């Protein structure tokens, strides 16, 4: 986590909420490159070797099976290039897409810049709508456009979601309107994403999200236990997400997601 250096008093005041805490990190690390490098370290320092039996490995294999379908594309809210690494391992041609604002020397904002690796019409399209920070060896190798693509702080999100015609917003609306989406590893708690889903919701939900039937519960003494949702809990959650166009697919716990995805892969002819 990039938050480990934040004094506990500040975290207590902020309630350890991600957006204002990220904003505080950016305020402390005033240098754009220093802040981006801290994010980079939090993403890649503990990275594990590629394993096709993991969630990302199965997603990459699913993409490999579907790469010939021009309607198949991937939207990621992650900043890392782990999925790209898996796709490269499987020889799947991938176009990583992101956007940022660049500033001219006279202080005027330019139009949106779209960064892409490869040609979107000739490869799988992977949309990084909250920014893209691929792995590099050293701090000095960080690319300015990648650094300025990151949407992480309170100010970043406020600016992004107050621009209804921006590329990230238009891309998400396009996905939600034109595709049947499967949400993997996404809690769907972000109010901005929920608002876009609600805007595009139809009479019958057409999207799907994988949720776990178990959850972590912490008591007053700080002890954590694993509990299971009751059938009533699950029904209430299903009804809640039905309103914004989401059907819930239940697994016993999140460790089952790779198995679920593997079975989906095997079912595709």
Which residues make up each language-model segment?
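Active-site gating loop/helix substructures
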Residues: 93-176
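Metabolite-binding pocket within alpha/beta catalytic cores that recognizes anionic/polar moieties
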Residues: 31-96, 100-101
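Short, solvent-exposed loop/turn segments at secondary-structure junctions
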Residues: 79-82, 132-136, 187-189
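Short loop/turn segments at strand-loop or loop-helix junctions that form parts
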Residues: 79, 128-132, 213-216
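SIR2/sirtuin-family catalytic core signature
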Residues: 1-5, 12-20, 30, 34-35, ...
């Amino acid at each position: 986590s990039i938050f480990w250096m934040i004094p506990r008093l500040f975290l207590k005041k902020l309630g350890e909420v991600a957006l204002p805490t990220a904003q505080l990190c950016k305020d402390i690390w005033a240098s754009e490159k220093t802040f981006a490098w801290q994010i980079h370290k939090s993403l890649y320092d503990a990275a594990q070797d590629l394993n096709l039996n993991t969630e990302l490995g199965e997603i990459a294999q699913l993409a490999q099976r579907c790469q010939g379908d021009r309607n198949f594309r991937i939207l990621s809210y992650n900043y890392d290039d782990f999925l790209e690494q898996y796709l490269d391992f499987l020889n799947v041609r991938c176009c990583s897409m992101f956007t940022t604002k660049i500033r001219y020397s006279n202080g005027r904002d330019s139009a949106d810049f779209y960064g892409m690796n490869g040609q979107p019409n000739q490869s799988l399209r992977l949309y990084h709508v909250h920014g893209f920070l691929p792995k590099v060896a050293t701090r000095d190798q960080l690319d300015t456009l990648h650094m300025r693509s990151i949407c992480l702080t309170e100010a970043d999100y406020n600016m992004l979601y107050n621009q209804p015609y921006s590329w990230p917003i238009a891309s998400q609306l396009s996905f939600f309107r034109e595709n049947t989406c499967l949400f993997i590893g996404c809690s769907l708690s972000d109010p901005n994403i929920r608002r876009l889903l609600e805007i595009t919701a139809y009479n019958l939900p057409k999207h799907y999200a994988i949720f776990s039937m178990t959850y972590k519960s912490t008591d007053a003494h700080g002890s954590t236990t694993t509990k299971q949702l009751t059938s009533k809990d699950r029904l209430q959650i299903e009804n809640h997400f039905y309103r914004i166009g989401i059907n819930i697919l239940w697994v016993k716990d999140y460790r089952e997601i790779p198995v679920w995805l593997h079975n989906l892969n095997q079912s595709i002819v």
